[in-house]
């Protein structure tokens, strides 16, 4: 039975990844600092290590105590607005954490990593749909940190033979009702939970930035992927690498709906 390390496995997407891996018969080890994640969301993992990826001793202990066959990395700060006001926080956490993780992988002979990246690496796209070969020019530090990690992964493949699959996507949505996990951000920043809370009377109103886009209501088009589909894509990427697949970058996700429509149907 293979053992997979899920970095950031107590977060929204990471916890769904853990649940899916366990269901598919993998042993799972989780590393999370619990700054935005929740230990209660980690279901079925062999062990949850609470600590900072930038702590080399913490990672050395984790890799020494567990024979890790592959890594899936979700660990990152991800608020675009905050990244603009505090870019050093994002470079310090996201990039330095990834450097430390790759150093531990190299030291312990682990040669496969699935990196949860972002479509924010593209910035303002010149055309749609976006293709993996399109220009990458992030417009915020969050996207820039993810692109920096992608570039670092490319060089680590060439230098150390650590193969990677980087997955670029926009917005995750949904939950795994069977596993009893879902979105739990504090403060909540994702649009769909905010819309649902407004519909339930838990908020007075919802504000959406943008009013001059070429859409029926003037707001921008958002691309969504269900969180279980997203976890499935990360698992497929892991299996691709396990079969000897070459390092690459992949785009994920498409859902062209008005956010208000499913909310009305649920109501």
Briefly describe each language-model feature range.
Residues 170-173, 212, 256:
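Glycine-rich beta-alpha junction loops
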Residues 119, 225, 253-256:
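Structural/interface elements that position substrates and couple domains in central-metabolism enzymes
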Residues 1-175:
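N-terminal Rossmann-like NAD(P)+-binding domain of SDR-like oxidoreductases, especially those catalyzing
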Residues 257-267:
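Single conserved hydrophobic/aromatic residue that forms the stacking wall/gate
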Residues 16, 37, 86, 104, ...:
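Generic structural signal for alpha-helix termini and adjacent loop/cap motifs
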Residues 147, 160-162, 174-193, 201-204, ...:
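Glycine/proline-rich active-site loop of Rossmann-fold NAD(P)-dependent oxidoreductases
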